[in-house]
């Protein structure tokens, strides 16, 4: 089962947001939905332009994400995908502190505050 805060490789070949075949993505949908729905909501991770982190982005240090490389999420790219697009096992998992930072960027992007 997919868990909120988990990082998974996702096949985004059919997505308008990516030209690469698979990309590590962070699950942001709630765990009840993740368990019972056929879809999951994700944010793709980027490993480029890490020298500048905007307010709608969140830096994910390798040591705290389990990825082995630094990355960032951009909360303006939120995608709901079919679970069959996920390829392989979980790559990493964000701790509570990092998820709180991600949630802050989501609230900003979605004007929830």
Over which residues does each language-model region extend?
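Short, charged beta-turn/beta-strand-edge "cap" motif at the junction between a beta-strand
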Residues: 13-17
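Compact nucleic-acid interaction/catalytic patches
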Residues: 18-22, 27-63
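C-terminal terminal-subdomain/extension
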Residues: 63-113
């Amino acid at each position: 089962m997919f868990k909120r805060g988990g990082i998974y490789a996702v096949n985004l070949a059919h997505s308008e947001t990516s030209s690469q075949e698979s990309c590590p993505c962070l699950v942001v949908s709630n765990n009840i939905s993740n368990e019972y729905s056929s879809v999951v909501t994700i944010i793709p991770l980027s490993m480029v332009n890490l020298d500048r982190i905007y307010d709608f982005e969140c830096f994910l240090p390798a040591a705290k994400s389990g990825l082995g490389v630094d990355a960032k999420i951009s909360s303006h790219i939120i995608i709901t995908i079919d679970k069959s697009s996920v390829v392989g096992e979980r790559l990493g998992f964000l701790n509570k502190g990092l998820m709180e930072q991600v949630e802050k960027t989501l609230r900003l992007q979605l004007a929830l505050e």
